């Protein structure tokens, strides 16, 4: 039920211009938290029958896979095809936990060595690095299970998703008055407090200034079902019942988060955004894993495609589009156990995949898993098995690499002591 | 002069929608006036709700999810219910529903299933949102279903209400906060009684226990003897998640501020342990308390779960079977190297252990400090003072009051002898 807005600089980071990392860096950032546990077989680590042990499913034929830029992806990734030159996939990342809550805190911070669940999230740290003076470093969109309340330095809790709060802000700013008089500010501060938020007035005023004149997007209406289940995309294994369930469930939460993320980034309200993929129950597939993960991943990819299309159509700076400016990280707090349980579900697994999208990346699929989906050691220079210094990739490496990607200064001082995965960078 | 106004105090306490304070002056400035105002506000349900979300966030995390029935057209002059799809008349069966045992209703046979209380492989109760696929129905007397969405909402609310009102009782009566985790009795309504009655029925099979006055207002009343440990055995916790280790983890995290950290659960270790055990998740895994990479968390989780061995956890309902209980357990603090105590495996003992740990007082003081100072750093001297006082008294109302006064007027105000008494 809680959502958070991280607003306070804590030792602002200056952006370095040289050093390790990519040639071009994102200037905006989105973290998508697939809350509940993504089954990588359905997305970025597909396998054929002869690549995995018996009883591990799903498996694909060569014809079903999406192959591009040296990547081999599951059919549900097909909507991303136009953008695969900007995508870097990392498989076999050791997260080291099979607990949702532990994993969620780890994912929020993108590291394993959690010192406190109250420490800044990666979204906040990235926001601080990208725009130190921004009054709002990171927005949290969508409901985070209160188990996993996102925390980031001084935290603002509210009763509903932040986009509801934003709607109220923008309503006051846009509808009530022509200018931001003291009266409006007081009203909004009141709203903020009514929502049991806990922040000083200054960032609220700064936020209002940034929101002034912005058009609030209408409620998202995005019927992806017709696309998901179009003849050329539909996997025959998806049952009619699963399709009916998908349509009945709708995709409002996910699409609304994508829509608000776009609004925030496009209008420079905050440099960094965190969003949830939707209900944790949808993704925590201890029962009927294959049907549910199939629908969920298809849904997520279609939402992502919509978001990337919008970025590509939105002007950025220097004649570029927002697509050249936004860095995206997608991951789950846990993976799914390779074998089905007694309820045709999959339990937890201490290993995840990550998808990075954005400028400065080397397109490709890195990390590798074996016949039981266990991550193999890889060479830190190439990201692939083979070499004298092979090592298992960890979540700490992902966090450190993301901070490197956005140009954060001295990540180690913030406790990010993983290794930089240079192979991700162009 | 006070550094925060009474209106700001209201914001902190979540009571800003209440009418303005009735004080001698509209601009209160003395410690005594602030104390008077704060004490009045601490008696408000809105404040208790604010505090509960700060101190006990796990109890507000999940819906209970009894399934709501849909009432179809009356058949043969009797109410007819179904869950998803109406069935032909030939498949209807007559049942006395728990919400009115003096009458009978019609329900589709496949949605009744009074004998199916577990999933088909007997590994979990009928707990999952997808449980219809396991063959679970509404159960005897339709105990696992609500009559309609409205009744489901009332049932859900009753669980949360029990936690809030019991916390409010502890605050109002100045009982030590430790009682919240050790007492048997709770404050609950008739709908709150329903959950206990259902468990008693499943235990003893006597339908008489289901004759509850559902519209009874909330009062402080005892529970069956197995329900020790106050909050620990309230439905709000027992029903919070069918993944019982999640609940255990939250206890350490939220009551002691001791987070669980992954050390290194290796994929191959897990594969070797579970490859051929499809029911692994629902089983006890005391071997993990000594397994490297697992033991730092599971020493707390598995021994903590021993206190609840008699219960089955679940989001729709739990049952209690004394034959499943075990004799003894242990209490670990930060990790597997930190054994604090050994004792009887009951919720009451576990609750007493939690509140006797030094981390409990420190954690509560920390959370109240976060609430009152709105995320700003709490002065170290004040924290030390409050920790010492709260460890001695466990008086939650005084803790909040003193923290607010110290923020408003400074620590010296407390140490000069004007602390609450």
Label every model-predicted segment.
Chain A
Residues 1-426:
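Ligand-binding pockets and gating/stacking loops
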């Amino acid at each position: 039920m809680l959502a958070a807005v991280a607003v306070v600089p804590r030792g602002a980071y200056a952006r370095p211009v040289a050093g390790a990392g990519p040639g071009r860096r994102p200037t905006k950032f989105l973290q998508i938290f697939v809350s509940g546990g993504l089954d990588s077989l359905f997305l970025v680590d597909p396998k054929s029958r002869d690549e995995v042990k018996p009883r591990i499913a799903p498996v694909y034929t060569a014809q079903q896979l999406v192959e591009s830029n040296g990547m081999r992806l599951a059919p549900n990734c097909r909507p991303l095809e136009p953008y695969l030159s900007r995508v870097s996939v990392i498989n076999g990342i050791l997260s080291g936990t099979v607990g949702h809550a532990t994993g969620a805190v780890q994912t929020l911070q993108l590291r394993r060595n959690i010192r406190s669940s109250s420490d800044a999230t990666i979204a906040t740290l990235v926001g601080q690095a990208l725009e130190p003076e921004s009054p709002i470093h990171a927005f949290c969109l969508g409901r985070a299970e209160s188990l996993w309340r996102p925390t980031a330095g001084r935290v603002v809790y509210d009763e509903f998703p932040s986009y509801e709060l934003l709607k109220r802000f923008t309503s006051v700013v846009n509808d009530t008055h022509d200018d931001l008089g003291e009266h409006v500010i007081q009203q909004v501060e009141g709203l903020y407090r009514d929502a049991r938020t806990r922040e000083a007035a200054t960032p609220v005023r700064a936020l209002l200034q940034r929101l002034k004149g912005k058009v609030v997007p209408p409620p998202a209406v995005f019927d992806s079902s017709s696309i998901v289940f179009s003849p050329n995309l539909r996997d025959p294994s998806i049952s009619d019942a699963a399709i009916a369930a998908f349509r009945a469930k709708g995709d409002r939460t996910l699409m609304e988060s994508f829509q608000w993320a776009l609004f925030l980034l496009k209008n420079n309200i905050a440099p960094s955004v965190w969003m949830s993929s939707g209900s944790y129950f949808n993704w925590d597939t201890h029962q009927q894993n294959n049907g549910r993960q199939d629908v969920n991943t298809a849904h997520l990819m279609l939402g992502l495609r919509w978001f990337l299309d919008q970025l590509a159509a939105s002007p950025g700076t220097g004649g570029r589009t927002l697509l050249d400016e936004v860095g995206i990280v997608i991951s789950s707090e846990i993976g799914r156990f390779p074998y089905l349980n007694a309820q045709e579900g999959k339990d937890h697994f201490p290993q995840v995949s990550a998808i990075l999208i954005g400028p400065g990346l080397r397109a490709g699929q890195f990390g590798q898993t074996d016949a039981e989906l266990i991550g193999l050691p890889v060479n830190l220079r190439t990201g692939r098995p083979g070499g004298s210094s092979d090592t298992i990739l960890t979540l700490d490496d992902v966090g450190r690499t993301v901070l490197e990607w956005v140009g954060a200064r001295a990540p180690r001082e913030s406790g990010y002591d993983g290794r930089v995965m240079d192979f991700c960078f162009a | 002069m006070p550094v925060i106004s009474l209106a700001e105090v209201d914001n902190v306490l979540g009571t800003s929608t209440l009418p303005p304070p009735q004080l001698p002056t509209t601009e209160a400035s003395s410690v005594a006036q602030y104390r008077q105002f704060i004490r009045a506000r601490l008696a408000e349900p809105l404040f208790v709700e604010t505090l509960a979300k700060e101190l006990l966030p796990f109890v507000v995390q999940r819906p209970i999810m009894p399934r709501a029935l849909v009432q179809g057209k009356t058949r043969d002059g009797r109410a007819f219910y179904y869950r998803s799809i109406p069935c032909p008349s030939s498949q209807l069966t007559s049942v006395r529903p728990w919400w009115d045992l003096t009458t009978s209703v019609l329900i589709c046979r496949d949605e009744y299933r009074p004998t199916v209380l577990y999933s088909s492989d007997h590994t979990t109760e009928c707990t999952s949102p997808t449980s219809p696929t396991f063959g679970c129905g509404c159960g005897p007397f339709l105990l696992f279903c609500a009559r309609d969405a409205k009744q489901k909402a009332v049932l859900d609310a009753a669980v949360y209400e029990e936690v809030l009102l019991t916390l409010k009782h502890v605050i109002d009566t100045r009982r030590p906060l430790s009682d919240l985790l050790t007492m048997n009795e709770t404050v609950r309504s008739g709908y709150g009684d329903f959950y206990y009655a259902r468990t008693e029925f499943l235990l003893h099979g006597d339908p008489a226990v289901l004759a509850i006055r559902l519209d009874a207002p909330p009062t402080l009343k005892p529970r069956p003897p197995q329900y020790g440990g106050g909050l620990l055995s309230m439905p709000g916790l027992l029903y919070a998640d069918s993944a019982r280790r999640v609940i255990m983890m939250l206890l350490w995290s939220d009551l002691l501020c001791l987070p669980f950290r992954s050390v290194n659960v290796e994929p191959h270790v897990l594969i070797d342990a579970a490859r051929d055990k499809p029911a692994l998740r629902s089983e006890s895994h005391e071997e993990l308390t000594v397994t490297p990479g697992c033991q730092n968390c599971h020493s707390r989780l598995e021994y903590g779960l021993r206190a609840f061995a008699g219960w089955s956890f679940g989001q729709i309902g739990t049952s209690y079977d004394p034959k499943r209980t075990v004799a003894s357990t242990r209490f670990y603090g930060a990790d597997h190297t930190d054994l604090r105590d050994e004792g009887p495996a009951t919720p009451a003992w576990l609750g007493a252990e939690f509140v006797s740990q030094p981390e409990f007082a420190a954690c509560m003081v920390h959370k109240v400090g976060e609430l009152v100072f709105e995320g700003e750093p709490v002065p170290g001297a004040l924290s030390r003072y409050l920790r010492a006082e709260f460890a001695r008294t466990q008086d939650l109302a005084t803790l909040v009051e003193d923290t607010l006064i110290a923020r408003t007027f400074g620590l010296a105000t407390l140490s000069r002898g004007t602390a609450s008494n």
